[in-house]
Amino acid sequence: MIYTLDSYNPEKEGRLPVFIWAYPREYTSKKVASQVRNSPYRFTRINYGSPIFWALRGYAVMASTEMPIVGFDGDQPNDSFRDQLVMNAKSAIDKIVDMGVGDRDRVGVGGHSYGAFMTANLLAHSDLF
């Protein structure tokens, strides 16, 4: 889900800084990882720690961004955690930039619990942020 202000107009305002909020999930197969788990008909829940707050500050917020970590050929998903994580983050950034919404040079990332572990790994092992 991507959140921006209702008044945001890409033609007038240009590209926005981006905040990616994610939580990686581990899967043992590509088939299971590809299942749809979200719906555009869900209610948006905002609480004191919600990343959606940043949309009110002019960011494009990618909330609940999918970061699947898949085990291949009997390997455990975490055997290739970093590589898949960086690939997922790059894909998310490429998508929002291709949509004309996000600015590739102003991207931040965050998450809670395992999402914080993901954040630390992305900051340490990529040059995306």
Feature locations, PLM:
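Serine-hydrolase catalytic core recognition
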Residues: 1-129
